[in-house]
Amino acid sequence: YAGGIQRVTIAKANKLALKNEVWIIVTDNKDKPVFPLSTKVHLVNCDINYFEDDWKSRFYILKGIIYKRKQHKKRLKEILNQIQPDIVISTGTSEKNFLPYLSVSSHPVFIREIHSNKNYRSLHAQSVFDKLLAILGDFIDYRIHLKKYDRTVVLTKEDKVVHWGKNTEVDVCVIPNPIISFGSKKASLINKKVIAVGRLAFPKNFSSLISAWKYVIERHADWTLEIWGEGELRTELEEQIRNNQLTNNIFLKGYTYDIFSPLYEASIFTLTSLFEGLPLVIIEAMSCGVPVVSYACPCGPQDIIADGHDGFLVPVNNEKVLADRICRLIEDKELRKEMG
């Protein structure tokens, strides 16, 4: 699955490669990149394949991580000493906790990018055991390893002020994600269709959106909801849709490489995430003239949307208010145009 981090990283690499020598080092990508990669960018695969253990038990995942992490450190160190880079950037994936400790003869500047809310582990945790793991993970990551980096980059002012303002051990700056593309035209806003986009996974909170849609169809049974994306919760969400007798109203459309085609056909865009980094899809929806109704989750939506002016912000998991804001836009075409 190619998500926002991959998309943004490739876009930045393409731009930097115009005047610099740029390398992207990956661990799992056996195929060509999903998004266009400049021929000036060098792509190297460590061939670690963390993802092949994703669906196994925790024992096998832990066993695999220990063995593969050792391989990863060895191969990454070899590659970096061959490249002799001036700057090395971690996007916050599997290398983040060992990268600044590697012995690289060019003595590069190490930069850590954080593409999600600082508290994503605790926000993601559901069981008591997972919450304890989240506390431990945050301590190891932020209190031990992160201060070894020369600079840390977060995506929003909200994240820096709320989560990093009192931390004097870490040098934090704000660099928002680039706006990679805008819609080439405006949506007509005449179709009776609301769309949402994202991985079918716990953080995207589509179960809450499905629950809210029950209230929407009480007032507007002729409107439909399309959810674009794939993920591990597809079966569970399909069951929720069936159990709530919404199979004629909600459609899971799968993954698309072209997000603008669905946006052009939409009249409203909605985001119900529990947490975000900086959701580019909100900006892309706005660029197509599609009004946005979003949960005011940390972090990102509140940096982009002025509530009641160019969209609506709703308290997280307040499904009745979410449905009400969607219905207000359904019932007022002029408001849709104004907010879009």
Model-based region annotation:
Residues 3-11, 192, 196-215, 232-238, ...:
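A conserved mid-protein helix/loop that constitutes part of the nucleotide-sugar donor-binding site
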Residues 291-295:
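Short hydrophobic beta-strand element within catalytic cores of glycosyltransferases
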Residues 238-254:
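Nucleotide-activated donor-binding/catalytic signature segment of Leloir-type glycosyltransferases, i.e.
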Residues 1-2, 15, 19-63, 174:
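N-terminal strand-loop element at the rim of the active site
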Residues 306-308, 312-319, 327-334:
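Conserved acidic donor-binding segment of nucleotide-sugar-dependent glycosyltransferases
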